[in-house]
């Protein structure tokens, strides 16, 4: 990625101290087209500020725009919704930070972006080609950190965690049916997936298991999600004072970078 960025940056006016390596580290999974798009977005940000030279100040927000879509600062949010979002994102961040097998939290924001009310950005320290079961388990708990925080601090759940629940359910299903990581069902896969080219590469699944096994798969998925939620709730309950500090900082500043977030945890 570093080399691709250098190629696309060669015809752009970058400040001398721009850290291309840092940008490469923050863009795992980006294709060549994504990286080109990122530099184009940074050039647009720079032009809007009537600046001639692209700096890290324009490059870092461009990463988030490519991943999550544009900021929607014009969207009017009530104080109550803002507060719920702050607890929700603080829940993700705290659970993610305290579990050993998750990617480091780089940024937390309660500024709406794309379709999200806020976001917590975690990035791997290095490129990964394999994923372990312990990583999936901890990631599940982090995904449910927002749901857990809403339940603990408000005694209610909003529609905010719906995409988290979809991701968690999909991850749990993959643990059981694709990666053979279920203790109960053992080292095998379930459901033959075939690409249906004429449907635009939509995946068709051929069910190669019984109704009884289907129920066991559902039970295992539910058990994984419930255990992850239990883990998230335990962490948040034990760290309530820290949560309050993170929430207060988010409500004041709207965005916390990695260093500012970690300073609050001391």
Q: For the regions a protein language model found, what residue spans apply to each?
A:
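Generic detector of short, locally flexible boundary/turn motifs and exposed helical patches
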Residues: 1-2, 25, 52, 57-61, ...
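Short, conserved phosphate-binding/catalytic loop or strand-edge motifs used
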Residues: 60-63, 114-116
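Soluble catalytic regions of large protease machineries
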Residues: 82-87, 93-266
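Short pre-active-site segment immediately N-terminal to the catalytic Zn-binding motif
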Residues: 74-84
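Conserved C-terminal "switch" segment of AAA+ ATPases
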Residues: 2-60, 69-70, 74, 143-151, ...
């Amino acid at each position: 990625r570093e080399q691709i960025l250098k190629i696309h940056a060669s015809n752009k006016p970058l400040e001398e101290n721009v850290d291309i390596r840092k940008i490469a580290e923050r863009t795992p999974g980006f294709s060549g087209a994504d990286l080109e798009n990122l530099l184009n977005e940074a050039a647009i940000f720079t032009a809007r500020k009537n600046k001639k030279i692209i700096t890290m100040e324009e490059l870092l927000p461009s990463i988030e725009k490519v991943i999550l879509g544009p900021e929607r600062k014009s969207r009017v949010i009530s104080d109550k919704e803002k507060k719920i979002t702050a607890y929700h994102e603080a829940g993700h961040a705290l659970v993610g930070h305290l579990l050993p097998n998750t990617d480091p939290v780089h940024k937390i924001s309660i500024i709406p972006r794309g379709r999200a009310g806020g976001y917590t950005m975690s990035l791997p320290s290095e490129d990964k080609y394999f994923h372990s079961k312990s990583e999936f388990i901890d990631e599940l708990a982090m995904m449910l950190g927002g749901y857990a925080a809403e339940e603990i601090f408000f005694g209610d759940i909003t529609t905010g965690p719906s995409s988290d629940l979809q991701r968690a359910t999909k991850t749990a299903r993959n643990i059981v049916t694709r990666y053979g990581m279920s203790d109960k069902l053992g080292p095998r896969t379930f459901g033959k997936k075939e690409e249906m080219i004429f449907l635009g590469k939509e995946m068709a699944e051929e069910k190669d298991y019984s109704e009884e096994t289907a129920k066991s798969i559902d039970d295992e998925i539910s058990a994984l999600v419930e255990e992850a939620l239990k883990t998230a709730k335990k962490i948040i309950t034990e760290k309530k004072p820290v949560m309050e500090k993170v929430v207060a900082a988010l409500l004041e500043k709207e965005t916390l970078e990695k260093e500012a977030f970690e300073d609050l945890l001391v």
